[in-house]
Amino acid sequence: MKNLFRISLLALAIIFTSCSDDDDNQTLPVETNTIVDIVAGNPDFSTLGSALAITNLTSVLASEGPFTVFAPTNDAFADFLTANGFATLEDVPVDALASTLLNHVVGGAVNAADLSTGYINTSATFNGEADAPLSMYVNTSEGVMLNGISSVTTADVSADNGVIHIVDAVITLPSVVTFAAADAATFSELVGALTRADQPDYVSVLTTANGTAPAPFTVFAPTNQAFADLYAELGVAGIDDVDGAILTATLNTHVVAGANVRAEDLVTGTVATLGDAVEIDATMATITDPNGRTSQVIVTNVQAANGVIHAIDTVLLPQL
């Protein structure tokens, strides 16, 4: 009987030892807190989660990154669908939806305090060209405003692979007009000229989607200071004092239609615009108008979905 008891204890010890070894060798699942995990765990991101799944971008935002994601809420997506005439998310063309989502993603983990007013690159691209990332205009004068249409409502939601900033509107793919309107500190005078009542409907033309003529556009955009210098040169008080026909011819001279010409693709020579031709010196980054007046390119490659903007320091005039 004693021997039987000892054998039973020995067997029990072996079983416990075996179980203990199994527990020691068992690999426990590692909990993650990626951007995708946060989206999945927040009911106010359910539409965003569905959009990522539809476009096969879920795996991208679950990868190592790091990424900064400006994440629209369900209400933001609802407003986007209504504004664009879509009944459901599934009605949005997949390629367009994917580009729109990528327009909310920036490489690197950037906290709100590290954002400053100016242009940054998103993960969306012009016409699928990797070397032509779409720009985003960030305005930090009052909170964080993106492209003039979307505000950060909750910042710095930390993830294992980056950071999320919650926004109140979908950041739609920008046109060249988007940046002119959003960057008022630089381009408000240009916007005033483009929208003057006696001028052609430049806004409608310059919001033409890429793939539809006359898009894409290359716009040489004079800054506010450039316009101030022009008013002094012409001896007028402001844009309202410029003759209508001259203003139209002047604005046309700043737009190249049918081409998205980034700074690295500019070549020296004569370039046709919607108005008079201009002379470009690619080496010096200058543009000379028909009157021999020279303008310096001071900001390059503000990339929209339907063209590119290069800011210049002098207004180009047509042949006077």
Where would I find each of the regions flagged by the language model?
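Mature, structured domains of secreted/extracytosolic soluble proteins
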Residues: 3-7, 19-320
